[in-house]
UniProtKB/Swiss-Prot annotation:
It comes from Mus musculus. The keyword Transmembrane helix applies. GO terms for cellular component: plasma membrane. This is Tetraspanin-13. The gene is Tspan13. It holds the Pfam family Tetraspanin. Residues 41-44, 94-167 are extracellular.
Length: 204
């Protein structure tokens, strides 16, 4: 059967949702791995990653069930939710790619000041103290603070990687944004196709 028929649309939609399922399980696994190995101690960061993973898993599950059963209501809600996710993700991805170094620094400083546990993780893993300057009276978990070695500030070290990370996140986000708009198009098309095995007198 040529691609574009009922079976092809169904198989493509199932494959797309299986991909989303794998990505969601990967996100949850990475968060659990980070906590298990002590790389991340911020429950807020881990909670956000796990919440995104669960949300993506539920969306994929709805899409998969709707595709397998050709369920009109599930497919409709799946299409609407996927469209909303596309709009948000596309906007965030474009923002990540558009940030200049000054804006990146301001964003990093806001995050630094509002996440104490993540701040401690960064200082410990990168062996630096303070964002732009280090106050010896402040508590710092970095090894340099416990020795005679001079501690450098974290802003220059984080800044080296921030641009690359934002470009990577923006690129990955754009890729998945286009898979989501593909999913919306496939779902719309699949909903309006008639199952060849169904009763010929039935409506779709």
């Amino acid at each position: 059967m040529v691609c574009g028929g009922f079976s092809c649309s169904k198989n493509c939609l199932c494959a797309l949702n299986l991909l989303y399922t794998l990505v969601s399980l990967l996100l949850i696994g990475i968060a659990a791995w980070g906590i298990g190995f002590g790389l991340i101690s911020s429950l807020r960061v881990v909670g956000v990653v796990i919440a995104v993973g669960i949300f993506l898993f539920l969306i994929a599950l709805v899409g998969l069930i709707g595709a397998v059963k050709h369920h009109q209501v599930l497919l409709f809600f799946y299409m609407i939710i996927l469209l909303l996710v596309f709009i948000v993700q596309f906007s965030v991805s474009c923002a990540c790619l558009a940030l200049n170094r000054e804006q990146q620094g301001q964003l990093l400083e806001v995050g630094w000041n509002n996440t104490a546990s993540a701040r401690n993780d960064i200082q410990r893993n990168l062996n630096c103290c303070g964002f732009r300057s280090y106050n010896p009276n402040d508590t710092c978990p970095a090894s340099c603070a416990k020795s005679t070695q001079k501690c450098s500030s974290c802003a220059p070290i984080i800044g080296e990687y921030a641009g690359e990370v934002l470009r990577f996140v923006g690129g990955i986000g754009l890729f998945f944004s286009f898979t989501e708009i593909l999913g919306v198009w496939l779902t719309y098309r699949y909903r309006n196709q008639k199952d060849p095995r169904a009763n010929p007198s039935a409506f779709l």
